[in-house]
C-alpha cells in the first residue's frame, strides 16, 4: 500500500474498467488507481520530469494554479517539474538535485507529529518507510518504498556510535523480518513514525519510547546510505 503525490510518474501495466494497474517509475511499486487521477504523457516526458529533472515542493501545504485560476492542493514532496504539461503553474519554493546530508534533518523536522497512516507519504498521514523515503527523495536521493528494501542499501554500521545524523536504523520482529525504520538524529535520538511522527531515544537494544518508558522496537541494523 502506498500513495502517489502530484507529479509522480508511472507506467500502466494493466487496465480493468475504470482502474489502471500501474508501476511507479521511481521505485517500481505496483498498485491500482482510478483512471481519472492520471494524465497520460510520453515515455520520454515521464523519464525527464519523473527522474532526470525533478523539482519538489518544500512547503508542508501549497497550491498549484490552472489556466482557469483554479487551485489544486499540493503537499511537501510534490514534483512540479511537469506542471506545464498539464497547463498548470507553480511559483512557490522548490528543491532540485542532491542536498548535503544535514539537510535531511531540516526536512525531517517538517513531518514531526504527522499522524501515522499505513501507506501514507504526506504530513496528513505517513508510515515509517514512507517518512524516510520522502525525506531522502526531497533531498535528491531515491530509496525504495518499504523498510525491508531500504535495509538492503548502503554500508552496515556495527554500533550507534559509528553513525551520524541522517543514517537509517532498521528494526525487526520476533521472526527476524524488518518491519520498521527511522532516521537517526544527534545524541542517540531517532525520528520515526509510530502512532505519529515522533522523536525517541535509541540504544543498542532498540527504540526507547519516551512516553511509555520502555523499548518499543528491536534494533536489527544501522545503514549509512549517503
Each model region followed by its residue ranges:
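Aromatic- and glycine-rich peptidoglycan recognition patches
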Residues: 40, 157, 185-226
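Active-site loop architecture of trypsin-fold serine endopeptidases
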Residues: 121, 172-180, 193-199
Amino acid at each position: 500500500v502506498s500513495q502517489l503525490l502530484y507529479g509522480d510518474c508511472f507506467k500502466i501495466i494493466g487496465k480493468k474498467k475504470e482502474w489502471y494497474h500501474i508501476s511507479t517509475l521511481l521505485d517500481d511499486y505496483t498498485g491500482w488507481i482510478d483512471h481519472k487521477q492520471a494524465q497520460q504523457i510520453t515515455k520520454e516526458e515521464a523519464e525527464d520530469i519523473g527522474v532526470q529533472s525533478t523539482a519538489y515542493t518544500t512547503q508542508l501545504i501549497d497550491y498549484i494554479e490552472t489556466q482557469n485560476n483554479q487551485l489544486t492542493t499540493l503537499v511537501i514532496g510534490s514534483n512540479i517539474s511537469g506542471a506545464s504539461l498539464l497547463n498548470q503553474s507553480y511559483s512557490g519554493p522548490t528543491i532540485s538535485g542532491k542536498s548535503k546530508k544535514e539537510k535531511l534533518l531540516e526536512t525531517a523536522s517538517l513531518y514531526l507529529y504527522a499522524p501515522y497512516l499505513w501507506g501514507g507519504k504526506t504530513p496528513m498521514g505517513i508510515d515509517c518507510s514512507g517518512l524516510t523515503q520522502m525525506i531522502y527523495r526531497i533531498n535528491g536521493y531515491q530509496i525504495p518504498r518499504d523498510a525491508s528494501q531500504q535495509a538492503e542499501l548502503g554500508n552496515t554500521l556495527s554500533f550507534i556510535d559509528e553513525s551520524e545524523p541522517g543514517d537509517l536504523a532498521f528494526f525487526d520482529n520476533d521472526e527476524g523480518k524488518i518491519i520498521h525504520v527511522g532516521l537517526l538524529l544527534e545524541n542517540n535520538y531517532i525520528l520515526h513514525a509510530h502512532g505519529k511522527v515522533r522523536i525517541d531515544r535509541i540504544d543498542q537494544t532498540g527504540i526507547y519510547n519516551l512516553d511509555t518508558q520502555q523499548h518499543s522496537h528491536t534494533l536489527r541494523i544501522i545503514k549509512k546510505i549517503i
